[in-house]
Amino acid sequence: MNLELLGHVELPENVKPGGFDHAAVHRASAKLYVAHTANDALDVIDCVHDRYSHSIQNLTGVAGALVSDEENLVFTSNRGENTIGIFAPDNEAGLAKVDVGIRPNGLAYDPGNGLLLAANVGDQGVPDSFTLSMVNALQHQMTSSIQVPGRTRWTVFDERAEVFYVNIADPGQILVVTSAEPTRVAQTIAIPAPGPHGLDLDPDRRRLFCACDAKQLVILEADSRETLKRIELSGSPDVIFFNRVLRHLYVAIGDPGVVEAFNTEDMRRLDTVQTEPGAHTLGFDAERNKLYAFLPKTHRAAVYADKG
């Protein structure tokens, strides 16, 4: 067993039906921020002591959290109010909101250019509402909107190539947007499995990991865009995280409620741990090799140590 259960962090009860979504860790303060969508709040966990700290309120339908350690910033995608939030970890009261497209979800950040991409899931009843919003994070201003062919999922930024990768659920694609020209889609990568959902990048070996609704994990070469391998999963995945030090990949699967861990050197499955039905999202503390699986029914986080 690679993933050892250390215990649980009790989180606030759900105010409305639902649960949690994307999470991110700020290294310097050892704070984990998780979108508690059911509560319109960002819950904050102390990763050193694995205990709940407090919640940041009034983030309607918050769906995602992203941290820039380089710029000391935290971003939120507030799907219920069509805004993104921006604040410094030591100044939560200074949280600023920027209007973006319809129902923002995925977030990725280019620290070199201060450019935030918000991937908007849109509304099927509103024509042309599947978009990407590009935001100047330092000036708190949306600078451009890019129409895309379908519902967006997660997104990541590749610092070496200076490009954003964005999953599109249908048609199954990864879109490429460059920092140099953040007003259009530069390239489209066809994905050989329906429903690209979770996405992460191995910046050293230049590989993209794309977890698809069709219970498949697709591995691509980031520069050539070629598909290298496809792996069957035990269910439809959502959030994934790549551990750059141990070179492990973690995949959250809400049904049946498991986390699968892979060795990315040979893509061998290392472990499968039971979480809870509906537990589709994770947080990863790279400093301590700890994984947090968010359990919606019992409103808590299961904490695992990756023993390598």
Which ranges hold each PLM region?
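Predominantly soluble domains enriched in secretory-pathway, periplasmic, or organellar proteins
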Residues: 1-308
